[in-house]
């Protein structure tokens, strides 16, 4: 494969990645490509000069945020006509850290056949839409949840039950929760191992309107090994 073909392949991967996640950084995109970011300056500059991407600094960060231009969005639809292109005009720091952490985790995974961002999953009928869905080479569907803060216990159980329902409807096979805090990890794992779980439902999809509705026996989820809980290092701005 010559240099032109290699760069064309890299450009396609970057455009699709940005369409899925909305934004990224040079170092994350380089990790995704499996190359050293230090040698990619000319390549990223060419993407900007070609009108495919734009780069801007966000206050409070050390790195430029890379997004698709409108022409870049059109390019993404050429690569994948059914792709829902995500675009943001503002970049709150918590949104950057959360998304970058998801992307960083994804770049470390081997044997990924396909993946779907939260934006793509919005078109599917998930009870509990995860942050990321990975399909591995064996066809196993793994939901990824990045928890950078401790949610209310009722909300945790509401999400747990949603995962169980999605598993029962064959939308997912497993869930991996990722935590920056070992204390929060231990708390979630403790809640998961309990039996029964308090059951919470909502009639309008709004978690602020959820109410207690009896209990649920999670033993089938425990036996299957539905959920796993791991410590990880979030992306550092």
Show where each model-derived region lies:
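Nuclease-adjacent, charged terminal/linker segments that flank catalytic cores
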Residues: 1-88
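Acidic-basic catalytic patches of nuclease active cores, encompassing PD-(D/E)XK
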Residues: 80-123
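Short, basic/hydrophobic alpha-helical segments
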Residues: 135, 162-169
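Non-catalytic C-terminal interaction segments of nucleic acid-processing enzymes
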Residues: 1-20, 158, 168-174, 179-237
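Active-site metal-binding core of divalent-cation-utilizing nuclease and nuclease-like domains
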Residues: 106-142, 150-152
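Acidic-and-aromatic substrate-binding clefts and catalytic sites of carbohydrate-active enzymes
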Residues: 33-38, 123-125, 152-153, 184
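Active-site-adjacent loop/helix micro-motif of nuclease/hydrolase catalytic cores
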Residues: 150-161
């Amino acid at each position: 494969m010559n240099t032109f073909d290699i760069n064309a392949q890299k450009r396609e991967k970057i455009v699709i990645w940005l369409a899925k996640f909305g934004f990224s950084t040079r170092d994350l995109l380089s990790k995704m490509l499996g190359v050293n970011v230090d040698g990619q300056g000319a390549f990223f500059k060419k993407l900007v000069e070609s009108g495919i991407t734009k780069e801007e600094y966000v206050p409070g960060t050390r790195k430029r945020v890379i997004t698709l231009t409108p022409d870049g969005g059109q390019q993404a639809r050429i690569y994948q006509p059914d792709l829902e292109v995500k675009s943001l005009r503002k970049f709150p720091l918590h949104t950057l850290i959360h998304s970058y952490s998801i992307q960083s985790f994804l770049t470390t995974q081997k044997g990924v056949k396909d993946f779907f961002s939260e934006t793509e999953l919005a078109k599917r009928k998930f009870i509990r839409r995860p942050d990321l869905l990975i399909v591995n080479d064996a066809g196993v569907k793994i939901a990824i949840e990045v928890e950078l803060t401790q949610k209310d216990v009722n909300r945790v159980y509401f999400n747990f039950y949603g995962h169980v329902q999605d598993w029962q409807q064959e939308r997912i096979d497993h869930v991996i929760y990722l935590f920056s805090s070992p204390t929060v990890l231990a708390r979630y794992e403790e809640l998961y191992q309990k039996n029964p779980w308090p059951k919470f439902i909502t009639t309008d999809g709004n978690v602020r309107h959820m109410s207690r509705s009896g209990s649920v026996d999670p033993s089938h989820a425990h036996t299957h090994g539905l959920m796993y809980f791991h410590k990880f290092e979030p992306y550092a701005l």
